[in-house]
Amino acid sequence: KFLSLFKSVIIKSVYCVNCGYCAAECKSGCIDMANGVHISNQCKHCFSCHDIYPHCLRYNSIKNRIGAKVMTGLDRYYSFGIKENWLRVYFDYEGTSSFWKSDGDGEVPNKKKDAFLNFVKDAGLVDEDKSLKGKEYKYIKYKPNKFAEKMFSLGVDDESMWAYLMCNLVYAEDSEEFRWFIKNIPFSETSTPESIKLRLDEVMENDKSGLGKRNICDALKSFLIKTPFGKQLGLGSVIDYEEKVSSNGRETITLNYFVRGSWKNPDEKVILYALYKFAEACGNYRQFTLTRLLDTSVESAGISPTQIFGLNRETM
């Protein structure tokens, strides 16, 4: 705990811009930021101002930059995200070319098909057949691999299947989207589309029109509401939204807020798979401790299953 607090003090000293978030978190009202930062002598040392993930809101918004480069691959699924039924149809076809040629029985036409292709690539379900060249092979050159065959055998209705996909999505080479979700959406706090956009501001500073941030929020909305990533796996254990269908069948969903929670029925095989992915990302270092896995403040290429699924010490 001391090391975490010590790190928090350094981070706050470097990145604080008096945004007022720490003052709002202080239950005793001991932090005053009206003119600089002043801590009252009545401070209870409850550390709630240090428990903000990861210690400072501004630091959290810029920590994913590398060499001052803005993160890329954050808008992989456009405004669509995916829907459970898209994957169901893909599984029914077992990922064959017939799925792509039929636009997934009409479920994924046009740009939706591009978004879904990015999803199956990021989820590790396909490998590229590089012998197939030309525009006509844009989709069908991506063939289901052995991992996909395992997922087909589990089926779309299996909660663990979606958990396996989430493990792959957070490590996707070409996409930062799920990795950003997992690292930046806080647990047990009310999040809104506006709060997500604020968190995205400094890693998408070139998004002057705001379209990219809107797309990401719309995609997140779809993941939360239209797939098991939301309530079942905990990315949105509580979701408040309104859904309307117009006379011509057009669906409109308004996300009011959501609260990230934990996966209530974790599968030990999935957790082992997540640990394998974690070790692989950490250079095959396998001598990690439970304390290390629970400490999400450590900067690392590996993402602990505790952070992916919100698992506590007892569950681990």
Model-based region annotation:
Residues 1-24:
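A broadly conserved sequence feature marking short terminus-proximal activation segments
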Residues 21-38, 44, 48-65:
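Iron-sulfur cluster-binding cysteine motifs and their immediate structural context
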Residues 31, 57-58, 121-134, 225-251, ...:
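A short, conserved structural fragment
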Residues 55, 262-316:
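Extended, charged low-complexity segments
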Residues 62-191:
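Short, amphipathic alpha-helical interface elements at domain boundaries
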Residues 90-106, 176-217, 283-306:
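Short acidic, hydrophobic short linear motifs in intrinsically disordered regions
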Residues 107-122, 210-235, 302-316:
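Short amphipathic alpha-helical interaction segments
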Residues 188-255:
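Hydrophobic, aromatic-enriched interface-forming segments
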